[in-house]
UniProtKB/Swiss-Prot annotation:
Organism expressing this protein natively: Escherichia coli O6:H1 (strain CFT073 / ATCC 700928 / UPEC)
The organism's place on the tree of life at top rank: Bacteria
Pathway in which the depicted protein is active: Amino-acid biosynthesis; L-histidine biosynthesis; L-histidine from 5-phospho-alpha-D-ribose 1-diphosphate: step 6/9; Amino-acid biosynthesis; L-histidine biosynthesis; L-histidine from 5-phospho-alpha-D-ribose 1-diphosphate: step 8/9
One Pfam entry name: Hydrolase_like
The gene coding this protein: hisB
Enzyme Commission code(s) on record: 3.1.3.15, 4.2.1.19
Protein name per UniProt: Histidine biosynthesis bifunctional protein HisB
Record carries keyword Amino-acid biosynthesis: yes
GO cellular component terms, semicolon-separated: cytoplasm
Organism placement in taxonomy: Bacteria, Pseudomonadati, Pseudomonadota, Gammaproteobacteria, Enterobacterales
NCBIfam families the UniProt entry points to: HAD-SF-IIIA (TIGR01662), hisB_Nterm (TIGR01261), Histidinol-ppas (TIGR01656), PRK00951.2-1 (NF002111), PRK00951.2-4 (NF002114), PRK05446.1 (NF003937)
Location, primary (coarse class): cytoplasm
Gene Ontology biological process: L-histidine biosynthetic process
Residues the record marks as active site: 9, 11
PROSITE patterns associated with the record: IGP_DEHYDRATASE_1, IGP_DEHYDRATASE_2
Length: 355
């Protein structure tokens, strides 16, 4: 799993910047920006790692002696640490603009190692700062930038923006047999649009979204002139991949789910979003098809989905009516998925520290 980073400016963003000389060189000049500590703690809990990056003009020269900088800076760091705020690294450019160095923001010299790491989640990493140079740094790094402002975009606003859940994924899967486009919104409900070319399968997929409490859009063009095998199988693979991506780092999810009765049927579903693909399936049908869906492909669908989603899935149903038996499986899976993907906290539900 890739890591989310926040590259945060110091003066004017974490602490106030004195308007007289723009230097925090005395203890009485040290003042934290409103709400910064609780919001940094909130962001850490949401899985972000923090990196401080700052330009300190002429640091170590007569105009800004190192000792004058060190006292307030060290006190600031001690306060952050005492409150649980941990910075992975503090990056400082000590040069003046006239020095034309290669490490001054918005140049990327100081952050080169992060850019070289494949593990950085660029889509969900940010530069946060109060100056245009901070936003330019974000552009140069190829990540997002947030322009801090006490009134327009303050720390509580930033914390809310970066921790608000809107888990989404878009997967496109093209083969010689099928062209599949899947979009999933785990934190939005209703409005699903599904078109696989297999009407009863569309109805079953809609049961997953409806009872799972999320929205999805699925468009499939498959080789139905042969049969429904590739369409059902590849849809399962694409949907499983989309669900896995949308779950992200899985922080705070319930992870497990169970259940469901339906008329004369009793369907049992147990789900663990474990990262370990496995399917146990037991269902018997009287006929080879329900509507235009082959009953033998139902197990194949769930096996494909569990494989790409990385879940342990147990499914079982008993009943008299094939339509009800099939529908009970999809409803049970959807209802169980609703429980498992629900967010209840901000910790990873695993003693191993990884899912």
């Amino acid at each position: 799993m890739s890591q989310k980073y926040l590259f945060i400016d110091r003066d004017g963003t974490l602490i106030s910047e004195p308007p007289s000389d723009f230097q925090v060189d005395r203890f009485d000049k040290l003042a934290f920006e409103p709400g910064v500590i609780p919001e940094l703690l909130r962001l850490q809990k949401a899985g972000y790692k923090l990196v401080m990056i700052t330009n300190q003009d002429g640091l170590g020269t007569q105009s800004f002696p190192q000792a004058d900088f060190d006292g307030p800076h060290n006190l600031m760091m001690q306060i952050f640490t005492s409150q649980g705020v941990q910075f992975d690294e503090v990056l400082i450019c000590p040069h003046l603009p006239a020095d034309e160095c290669d490490c001054r923001k918005p140049k990327v010299k100081l952050v080169e190692r992060y850019l070289a790491e494949q593990a950085m989640d660029r889509a969900n990493s940010y530069v946060i700062g109060d100056r245009a140079t901070d936003i330019q740094l974000a552009e140069n790094m190829g990540i997002n930038g947030l322009r801090y402002d006490r009134e327009i975009l303050n720390w509580p606003m930033i914390g809310e923006q970066l921790t608000k859940r809107d888990r989404y994924a878009h997967v496109v899967r093209n083969t010689k047999e099928t062209q599949i486009d899947v979009q999933v919104w785990l934190d939005r409900e209703g409005g699903s649009k599904i078109n696989t070319g297999v009407g009863f399968f569309d109805h079953m997929l809609d049961q997953i979204a409806t009872h799972g409490g999320f929205r999805m859009e699925i468009n499939v063009k498959g080789d139905l002139y042969i049969d429904d095998h590739h369409t059902v199988e590849d849809t399962g693979l694409a949907l499983g991949e989309a669900l896995k991506i949308a779950l992200g780092d899985k922080r705070g999810i319930c992870r497990f789910g169970f259940v469901l009765p339906m008329d004369e049927c009793l369907a049992r579903c147990a789900l663990d979003i474990s990262g370990r693909p496995h399917l146990e399936y037991k269902a018997e049908f009287t006929y080879q098809r329900v509507g235009d869906l082959s009953t033998e492909m139902i197990e194949h669908f769930f096996r494909s989905l569990s494989y790409t989603m990385g879940v342990t899935l147990h499914l079982k149903t008993k009943g008299k009516n094939d339509h009800h038996r099939v529908e009970s499986l999809f409803k049970a899976f959807g209802r169980t998925l609703r429980q498992a993907i629900r967010v209840e906290g901000d910790t990873l539900p695993s003693s191993k520290g990884v899912l």
